[in-house]
Amino acid sequence: TPIKSSAASDVYKRQEYHYIGAKSQHVEDWYRYPSSMDVRDFYGGDLQGVLDKMDYLEQLGVEVIYFNPLFVSPSNHKYDSQDYDHVDPHCGKIVKDGGRLLEGWETDNTHADRYILRTTDSENLEASDRLLIRVIEEAHKRGIRVILDGVFNHCGSFNKWLDRERIYENKPGYEKGAYISEDSPYHDYFSFHDNNRFLYNPTYDGWWGHDTLPKPVSYTHLRAHETRRHL
């Protein structure tokens, strides 16, 4: 049965950004069948909702809460991380908001002002991190353990280390992504087949060949020490 979600959980708006051939959208009809490619469709739900239901979960006898990745990411499954350092404000807390949505014909995410503000602003990121900490603390008070999923053999094309979408390119406080510049501090995090293609080099390795899932260099690779340290 569809539940009434908090206002924060409904923040994914239609046309907030473009991903894998279409715009993000908030699903209004819970009874429709999922599409074959619904990774950018969102049904609501956030960490505040989990926090609000913590007593109920305890009464049910829940001993463990297992989360899909909660890192910043454009997909609903979030196995294509955009920022490993922070909780996605769409699941956490959006303190600072505004900016335009993409027009129906637009596919360039450098114009996705609202999405960029929501996912790169330090106030939003830090507030979301604090909310996760509170969820964990309240769970532990009730003897409930929390497991956070994560994937590190690939990230996402939105990831700030690569920044194929150029979301971070002109944002203060962020380094240039490896897609954008050969001089990026993250250049050696990825394998490029042609280093003569900069600026904006699309020749990086992708997991199973998917360009939306760039693959950091193998942990056994000589260049991987910095990637290992960061993770």
Residue map of PLM features:
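A cross-domain feature marking catalytic cores of carbohydrate-active enzymes
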Residues: P69, L148-H154
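Short catalytic-loop micro-motif centered on adjacent basic/acidic residues
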Residues: I147-L148, R229
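N-terminal structural segment of carbohydrate-active enzymes
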Residues: S6-R145, K160, G209-P216
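Formylglycine-dependent
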Residues: F192-Y219, R223
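Aromatic- and acidic-residue-enriched segments that line the glycan-binding/catalytic groove
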Residues: D10-Y19, S75-G92, F152-P202
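Single conserved hydrophobic/aromatic residue that forms the stacking wall/gate
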Residues: T1-A8, Y12, H221, R228-L231
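Short, cationic motifs built from Arg/Lys/His that form the positively charged side of catalytic pockets
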Residues: I136, H225-E226
